[in-house]
Curated annotation (Swiss-Prot):
Protein name: Large ribosomal subunit protein uL13
Keyword Metal-binding: no
The gene coding this protein: rplM
Subunit field text: Part of the 50S ribosomal subunit.
GO cellular component: cytosolic large ribosomal subunit
Top-level lineage group: Bacteria
Function: This protein is one of the early assembly proteins of the 50S ribosomal subunit, although it is not seen to bind rRNA by itself. It is important during the early stages of 50S assembly.
One MF annotation (Gene Ontology) recorded for this entry: mRNA binding
Organism from which the protein derives: Roseiflexus sp. (strain RS-1)
Annotated spans, Disordered: 125-146
Gene3D superfamilies with a match to the protein in the record: Ribosomal protein L13 (3.90.1180.10)
Coiled coil: none
Length: 146
């Protein structure tokens, strides 16, 4: 009996919608990364983009534990002298709440072309509305802790 290897043309994608209200950032991001990579499917293959589309609503209501909302920093550099920028979690949530979750999920995906392709299947919206009703997304309930 031969081992089954999925081809890119055989991939069947689902659309899931996740409500981020009162979800912890890291725990939610790991579940999203699993869906995007397709690791929840029995046909998972690390070199095929077999994951599903994920729509996240209410990204502005995501939370962190402890004192992290004040202490967590996001850094970037423009590659120019003196171009180092730092912004706190609170500041980023006030301006662009969807970027916080995107950064967390991006760090959990492969740092390759495949990872960048998988990240394009993530759609994040700060509020409760999204324009993907035509895809008939299924409501995804994150796994309970414990």
């Amino acid at each position: 009996m031969k081992t089954y290897a999925q081809k890119a043309s055989e991939v069947q994608r689902e659309w899931y919608v996740i409500d981020a209200t009162n979800q912890t950032l890291g725990r939610l991001a790991t579940q999203i990364a699993t869906l995007l990579r397709g690791k929840h499917k029995p046909t998972f293959s690390p070199y095929i983009d077999g994951g599903d589309f994920v729509i996240v609503v209410n990204a502005e209501r995501i939370r962190l534990t402890g004192r992290k909302p004040e202490q967590k920093m996001y850094y970037r550099h423009s590659n120019y002298p003196g171009g180092f920028k730092a912004v706190s979690f609170k500041q980023l949530m006030a301006k662009h709440p969807e970027r916080v979750l995107r950064f967390a999920v991006k760090g959990m995906l492969p740092k390759t072309r495949l990872g960048r392709q998988q990240l394009t299947k993530l759609k994040i919206y700060a509020g409760p509305k999204h324009p993907h009703a035509a895809q008939q997304p299924k409501v995804y309930e994150p796994r309970p802790r414990g």
